[in-house]
Amino acid sequence: MQSIENKEKCELLCNAVCQPRCSKRLRHYEIISQCQLENDDALMNGEYCAFAANDNLQTAMMQKNFISPDDINSTYLPMGFKNFKLEGRTMAPLDFIEVLLYYLIKEEYKPMIRRYLQQIVW
């Protein structure tokens, strides 16, 4: 990673659910994009990765390519990376709330923000 030039132009995917080195990753993202554009989740049927069906933070955290907030602050920012991306378009709303809380909210505020966001979603 140190040898990458123009690190400020790179985007690092922090919570990828797709397995590392997945041979179908590009196809997975194409399908997700198409579903979003056409507002039709049925397009994923039969083509989407069975592993990614467990699309949540806990699944992502088990992957070796998972990047935690601590990793961002202690490793990637000092190396010059500045752009980090979170997956969430295919997640259930409450699962995506957990991703946002994990990455963006200080620990002491998480219970309050979680309750507030859950009320909005429900």
Predicted features by range, described:
Residues 1-122:
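Active-site pocket-lining/capping segments in soluble small-molecule metabolic enzymes
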